[in-house]
Amino acid sequence: MYLMNTYSRFPATFVYGKGSWIYDEKGNAYLDFTSGIAVNVLGHSHPRLVEAIKDQAEKLIHCSNLFWNRPQMELAELLSKNTFGGKVFFANTGTEANEAAIKIARKYGKKKSEKKYRILSAHNSFHGRTLGSLTATGQPKYQKPFEPLVPGFEYFEFNNVEDLRRKMSEDVCAVFLEPIQGESGIVPATKEFLEEARKLCDEYDALLVFDEVQCGMGRTGKLFAYQKYGVVPDVLTTAKGLGGGVPIGAVIVNERANVLEPGDHGTTFGGNPLACRAGVTVIKELTKEGFLEEVEEKGNYLMKKLQEMKEEYDVVADVRGMGLMIGIQFREEVSNREVATKCFENKLLVVPAGNNTIRFLPPLTVEYGEIDLAVETLKKVLQGI
């Protein structure tokens, strides 16, 4: 093999997909409850997304950000009007979006004081794998091989108001938070915690940054999770589902955080016409009347089925999440990797996460019968462990 050994891969090579199903080169069908890790929000090969990409590829795939392009302008308008009316910077990935947010936070602080540069983020958070976002990621297991990290970061206990309050000071320029911690095992923030984070950022003149790379783009039943909580950030990062499978990330800032000027930041590929056309299509689909309400209903249905399963199987320690972003945590005697492997062998794809958890992240277009099949398959796996 010519690929670097950076992933623990399952033994399948996929060649095509349709809806909630993905097929390997032998023709085996798998029920995909990973969505490419929260990416394929419209499922595989959604006809309107495919048509939009084909059409744009025939017109203009890429042009420099030294010029304007219509899909980029349209997507920025859609993101702004469907959030808090901010300005948008486009990147290619979630980690790129978070790196941009770090630079925005640092410049915001520097405009206030040379000493206002500290960034606070949560223990067990995940913000990306490039050096700045890795430093913001409060997980030493990812950080240790790449030390020394970027200076000026400190960590607080997630959902612990008192710890966040202790860490706040006048030299803090930003607080980074995932409204729902994804990689650490689907851990939602409490409303009280996010409300207090908002108050503290206002009190200390710091930016509140919400990383919605995984929990955004309709996954919770709202376009963005902050809309479920009613707590509005200064900076919002998104990626994954934004392109429906095409790489794209974005940062949305309010007027307060709109500090970048020409030369401060940039990207070659971010905001290219092809990716933005995909993003426009995704947002138009997600914001169609009734779509997000149905996501919430499906999420409630899935949660109910999984809670019933928890009562039936002692090895299940917890079920938590929001919308179609749900974590199933197992007791110590069962390995989440073993469960994920057995699910794979039974043609169900799930994502292992921290805290001995697997993630259910189906396409937002998943059908109720497919939800039933996924839960029944997981039950079958647990019976054999």
From Swiss-Prot:
Its EC number is 2.6.1.11. It is found in: Cytoplasm. Pathway: Amino-acid biosynthesis; L-arginine biosynthesis; N(2)-acetyl-L-ornithine from L-glutamate: step 4/4. InterPro entries: AcOrn/SuccOrn_fam (IPR004636), Aminotrans_3 (IPR005814), Aminotrans_3_PPA_site (IPR049704), Class-III_PLP-dep_AT (IPR050103), PyrdxlP-dep_Trfase (IPR015424), PyrdxlP-dep_Trfase_major (IPR015421), PyrdxlP-dep_Trfase_small (IPR015422). Keywords: Amino-acid biosynthesis, Aminotransferase, Arginine biosynthesis, Cytoplasm, Pyridoxal phosphate, Transferase. GO terms for cellular component: cytoplasm. CDD domains: OAT_like (cd00610). Disulfide bonds: none annotated. Binds 1 pyridoxal phosphate per subunit. N(2)-acetyl-L-ornithine binds at R129, T267. GO terms for molecular function: identical protein binding; N2-acetyl-L-ornithine:2-oxoglutarate 5-aminotransferase activity; pyridoxal phosphate binding. Its cofactor is pyridoxal 5'-phosphate. GO terms for biological process: L-arginine biosynthetic process. It catalyses: N(2)-acetyl-L-ornithine + 2-oxoglutarate = N-acetyl-L-glutamate 5-semialdehyde + L-glutamate. Pyridoxal 5'-phosphate binds at G94, T95, F126, D211, E212, V213, Q214, T268. The keyword Cell inner membrane does not apply. The modification N6-(pyridoxal phosphate)lysine is found at K240. Signal peptide: none annotated. Belongs to the class-III pyridoxal-phosphate-dependent aminotransferase family. ArgD subfamily. May also have succinyldiaminopimelate aminotransferase activity, thus carrying out the corresponding step in lysine biosynthesis. NCBIfam families: argD, PRK01278.1, PRK03244.1. Homodimer. This is Acetylornithine aminotransferase. It comes from Thermotoga maritima (strain ATCC 43589 / DSM 3109 / JCM 10099 / NBRC 100826 / MSB8). The lineage of its organism: Bacteria, Thermotogati, Thermotogota, Thermotogae, Thermotogales.
